[in-house]
Structures are given as C-alpha cells and as structure tokens.
Amino acid sequence: MLQLGRRLLLRVVLFKLLKKFIYWLLVILSVPLVLITRVIKPLIFIRFGYFFSDRMGHFPFDVEYYLSVLKQKSPQKYTFDYFFFVGTPCNNALVEMVRRKVRVYSAIKLLYHANNLVPNGSSHVIRPAKEINASRDIGANFQRTRRCLEFSPEEMQSGKNYLRGLGYPEDGRFVCLFVRDSIYLADVPNRDFSYHNYRDSNIDTYEKVAAALAEKGYWVFRVGKVVEYPLSIEHSRIVDYASSSDRSDLLDIWLMANCHFAISTSAGLDVYRYSLVLLF
C-alpha cells in the first residue's frame, strides 16, 4: 500500500512538472510574437495585462478602475490592450459584463510571460489596481466618470422580473444589507484568511435597522453569495435573498447596482457608485 501511494505521488509530481514544462515551452515559442509587437509599436501599441477574478472585492473594481482611467485619457486610436484572468472567476455574470468591455483571452497569459522574458517590456504591461493602490480609488476617478460596467437590456429585465415576482411596486425603493461573515473566504482552498475575521459581523445585530427601514416603506434585501446564518426576522418587505433559492450571480450584482443605498461592513461594489453606509 505504501509503495502504491509513492507511485501515485510520483505520477502527480511528474504530471505537474510536465505541465509546467509544456507551458514554459509555449511561452518561449511566443517570444517571436512579442518581438513583433516591439517592432510595430510606433504604429500599433499592444499591451498585456491581467485581472484577479477570484475575489469580488478586487475583480469588478480593478476592471472599472482601468476603464475609468482609460476614459479620461485622450483616445489612443492605435493602442490595443489584451487581458487574462488570474484565479477562478467569483461571478460568471460579471465575467460576461467584463468581456463586453475588455478583450480577455486565456492565451494572453503566454504573451504576458513571454513579454517579461524580453528586456524593456514594462511599457507593454498593464498592472491591476490591486497591485497599484490595493483596489482603492485614490485619485477619485469614479467621481469624474460614469460607470463603465453596464447591464445589457436583457440583464436589466431579468432583475426587474425578479422584483416583480416578489410583489415589489414599480415606484418602490430598496436597500441592500451586505454584512460580511467568515464563510465566504472559508471556501477558498489552501488559504488562511483568519486575519480578516475582525471585519466579520453577526447578521442578527442588523435586524432592528432592517425592520425600521421596512416600516418606512423600503424593501430590504440581505445580499451575499454565501452566508453563514440566515436572517431570522420576518417581514413582507425584508428579503433574505442571500439564503434563498433565487440567488444568482446576475442578481448578486444587479441588486447592489440598482439599490437606493446600501448598508455594509467594509465591503461592497464601489464601481456602481451608490450611496453607502459603512459600519465598522
């Protein structure tokens, strides 16, 4: 049995080494393409970049930040930017929205690494906001631009249909309650995020504010992709969407993007520029 286990381990190690060898061989074979981009730079400027797509706190922000900065610059007619995603995307609906605005191809990763092998390639690299400013809009770019990541007409209609199915009135207003807990990051394999625990809150402590808003006529949606505990309060205008079977990647974004305002614990989709009450 021990010998069989060693053989399996050896196979796994050899497979990983072979996979890595093939990848870097493809990177080296991509170097001529990179050299071509250097030669044609005076005529056509090609850049390579990436976005960390595995965390909602960085993925939409970094894309929106790139698009907002780009929008404020003079149009670069002959500049073409290409990206790839790092990590497993945290939201598939967001991936579709990003692809409508940005050229994203998995093969760009090869060209990105090939570019790094050739000297003087820094001007051909676009770093994500996560590495530049920790995904913070320090230069107030969002204040000077309209949001770039927009919903398609079909996506907008899907969100409205969801509200209509709940009996939500056409002239209604709703608030999103986005309370962070530890279960979301607990699903990330091989990573210890316990240092984020100080940001977590008990959803029960927000029941009074949810009830007060509901009594004032607001609808309150508790949002989140995965949550540790359900919302125990019951009210016709309080919806524990995060714990419901209606939850979807599209609605996760749509509700936050279209709320009247949001109540959150140091988390949220800043890219949609809604009013936000932060509680620490």
Regions found by a protein language model. Give the residues of each.
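Short, flexible/disordered intra-domain loops and linkers
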Residues: F52-R55, L185-R199
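Nucleotide-sugar donor-binding and catalytic loop/hinge architecture
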Residues: V39-I44, R136-D137, E154-C176, R180-D181, ...
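Residues at the starts of beta-strands that form the adenosine-phosphate
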Residues: T79-F80, W219, L279
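Catalytic donor nucleotide-activated moiety binding site of glycosyltransferases and closely related
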Residues: G172, L177-A186, I203-S248
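Secretory-pathway glycan-assembly enzymes, especially type II membrane glycosyltransferases
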Residues: L2, F15, Y23-M156
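A donor-sugar binding/catalytic signature common to diverse glycosyltransferases
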Residues: D252-F280
